[in-house]
Amino acid sequence: MNARRRHLRAAACLTLVGLLACLPLAAAFGSVNEDDMVLRLSAAERALPPDRLPDFDASCAALMDEDGTLWFGRNADDAAQIASLTKIMTAIVAADWLDASTMIEVTPEAASVGESSAGLAQGDSMTFDDALKALLTASGNDAASAIAQAAGARMLAQEGSGGDAHACEAAFVEAMNAKAAELGLENSFFANPHGLDFDAFAQGQYSCAADVATMLRAAMQIDLVRANIGFSQADITVQRDGAPVTLALENTDALLGSYPGACATKTGYTLAAGPCAASAVNRGDGHKYYAVVLGSSSKPQRFVDSAALYDWAYANRSSLRAPIADEDIAGLAWGERVAFTVAWFMEGW
């Protein structure tokens, strides 16, 4: 092993030792398990006791950092319903095709989706910027379909064809799955732009906590999406029957404005998915984290679960580092960095 690799392994060792040596005692042990993963190795493999893991009750979870490293996972790769977290991918794909000022028209099909709504009516029109707020703040299924149909129409036009609202939305969903492949999401399949998963909308869609974290990380790198995913409430203007109408939008989130550094949250719920949330925290300390919880025991609990993951990360991620250039470590593939980390941890435990 050359000197550079020895230094890199030492750096990885120091980082993980800093993470694991300082873990606080958990308040209760009922919501941790030996299959929970720290840097892709289970608590059992690391011989970690429950009091050295985050305590929360979601059935699936992922905690990812700005580099895409999965620091913690619980059933993070298991297929699950993600409900309205699907709208994160809708925003990502639409931003490839629509500008902030692009006008979005609400079709009869979009207005009639049902369930979670931004209060849009057939014939309403608004800018894509406002439509994103309706999508990400109010979690409007009407907004999701309207956006998908507008972007899908452009996709079909580029191919020299066209179609009705259903054809446009189908083209958009195809693009969602293409984007999933581009982002390396290996455990995701999208069937609609809003995430409904029952009755006519039960079309075999699925994702997983780790893939949703990757989606949110990608979304936060898009200026227009990032600017519209962090509102607790927002007002938008739609043109309705030839006159401007203001719609007040409310977010069901409980992290924004209350949890330190919370800068983005998307919530979701269906009976199949249970309460879920994807969120981002940035405290300006050089680290950004993305937490995803699926299948929490209640809607309020999904925010408690998210906070538990962030608390664990901020309490335990050490800044200790061997005297080696950051770019040397960053230049390694994620898997190679973790391989060094795991090897040193297992040797020294």
Predicted regions and their residues:
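Residue-level preference for non-acidic, small/hydrophobic
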Residues: 68, 85-94, 104, 135, ...
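Conserved catalytic neighborhood of penicillin-recognizing serine enzymes
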Residues: 113-154, 246-264
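Beta-lactamase-like hydrolase cores
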Residues: 14-15, 22, 26-85, 96, ...
